[in-house]
A protein has these predicted regions:
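Catalytic cores of nucleic-acid ligases and guanylyltransferases
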Residues: 1-314
Length: 314
């Protein structure tokens, strides 16, 4: 099956805005997925090219049932907790690699498509976004677990207030006349209701009291080629997460800290900086540390070397 470049990514926005030349979509709290079909060959891949198909057999079946048999579409795989997309709930499917076991999890998943990169042998990436979204809507039947990502035109500030009031993660603003570029671009902008950050896990502290497996994660981000320490995270774990993540950490242990020179916790244990987590937090301190961080889940779709501190763009 032919490959395409990595997916287009959004930059972090400083504040919501309204503009008739932009469209605004709901920011879904899931994992990015590229859906491909060439004849009978159907696949889902992550933004790093990892095969996601075994974890989501019902999505593969739904894509195979579409009349269209030649496409590349961009979207997000999500699970719901009530009316909210839940990255935490999706964790129960992300790490299951056997299709039979994936079905037994009883966690329904959905694929929300928002862009069409190729259709019927034609490359659409140079077309304006509005034209691509129009083609996407016509190309798929959007029944069952495959769904269309709706958008609003122009009134971004009002839509953002509504999104935050509903408990959504935020919005993605997209320039309506923009082409699809396989990079991070200011033509797509993330507008977040809360604050989240992807961070590299590079160590942990021993458990205390009744806690088992580990106490807190030691996390950081890359800056100027070095791994910068961003603090420790001791909340957001249930018993199962502590056990599963603890086993992963033990397998990655190394003797020396991978962080650049910093004031690091005593008695810490270090791991190869390969695992990437998603974390919620209240703010950054002046010295580049997280305030009130909480673990949301592991990200298997992000290389550790690409993790940098997200800074709002004006």
């Amino acid at each position: 099956m032919a490959k395409t470049g990595e997916p287009m990514k959004a930059k972090l926005g400083a504040a919501p805005f309204s503009d008739p030349d932009w469209v605004f979509e709901r920011k879904l709290d899931g994992i990015r997925a590229i859906a491909r079909r060439e004849g009978d060959a159907v696949s889902l891949t992550s933004r790093t090219g990892k095969n996601l198909s075994p974890s989501y057999p019902e999505l593969i079946e739904a894509l195979a049932a579409e009349p269209a048999d030649d496409f590349v579409a961009d979207g997000e795989i999500v699970a719901f907790d009530g009316s909210q997309t839940s990255f935490a709930k999706l964790q129960g499917r992300m790490h299951v690699k056997d299709p039979r076991l994936a079905r037994l999890t009883a966690i329904p998943v959905f694929l929300y498509l928002f862009d069409l990169l190729r259709f019927d042998g034609h490359d659409l990436t140079e077309l304006p976004l509005r034209a691509r979204k129009g083609a996407l809507r016509r190309a798929f039947s959007f029944h069952g677990p495959v769904r269309y990502t709706a958008h609003r035109n122009e009134h971004g500030e009002r839509f953002f207030r509504e999104a935050c009031d509903k408990g959504w993660e935020g919005l993605i603003a997209k320039r309506a006349d923009s082409a699809y570029s396989h990079t991070r671009s200011g033509n797509w902008v993330k507008l977040k209701c809360g604050r989240e950050q992807e961070l590299v896990i590079a160590g942990f502290t021993p458990p205390q009291g009744s806690r088992q497996h580990f106490g807190a994660l030691l996390v950081g981000f890359y800056e100027d080629g070095e791994l910068r320490y961003a603090g420790k995270v001791g909340t957001g774990f249930d018993h199962r997460t502590l056990a599963e993540l603890g086993a992963k950490l033990e397998a990655l242990e190394i003797p020396e800290p991978p962080f650049a020179a910093a004031d690091l916790p005593r008695l810490a244990r270090w791991v190869r900086p390969e695992l990437v987590g998603q974390f919620a937090f209240s703010e950054w301190t002046r010295d580049g540390k997280l305030r009130h961080p909480s673990f949301l889940g592991l990200r298997e779709d992000k290389p550790a070397q690409e993790v940098v501190r997200e800074r709002p763009e004006a």
